[in-house]
Amino acid sequence: MAAMVRYALAGNGEPALKAVLRPGEAREMNDRSQPEFAPVGDRQYHHFRIDVPKGVGKMTIDLKGFARAADFDLHLFANRTGFAWREDAAWGHVGEKTDKRLVIPDPKPGTYYISVFCATTVTASMGKYGVEYSGRTDVLNGVPYTIQVNFE
C-alpha cells in the first residue's frame, strides 16, 4: 500500500532525487517493488546527483536500457546549477532508443545533477467507457535501465 501511495504522488510537488550516484557503480533501475529503483515511466524524469572531486579530467555518464526495453526513447541530461531539466540542462543527449552517453571534459569540482527522461508515451483518447490508451502501452510498465558515472 505504501508503494502505491508513493507512486501516486510521483510527479506532484517538488522533484526528488532517486539517489546519489557513486563513480564506477552501475545503478539498476528495474525493481517495481521499490520506488527508488523503479523503471522510469512515460514522460517522467528520474533525478540523480553526483559529487565531483578536484582533479577529475573527464566525467562520462552512460545510460543503457535493458534488452527488452531497447526500443523505447530515453533522454539523458546533466547540469551543475540544479535539476537537469531538458529546457535548461548544460549537457544533453536526446534521440531514439535507450542507450546514451554524455562526456564532460574537465568538470569543475562540485555537485552535478543528472536526469533520465522517458520520451516514449501513450496516446490517450476518450472512448465509450472513458479514457482509452493506445500506442506504446507497454511503456506504462516502466522502462528499465542502468546508469553509471565514471571519472578519469
Residue ranges and their predicted role:
Residues 1-3, 114-115:
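Buried hydrophobic-core signal for structured, non-transmembrane domains
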Residues 127-131:
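Short, surface-exposed terminal/edge motifs of secreted or surface/virion proteins that either
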Residues 3, 125, 141-145:
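Extracellular and select intracellular beta-sandwich modules with Ser/Thr-enriched
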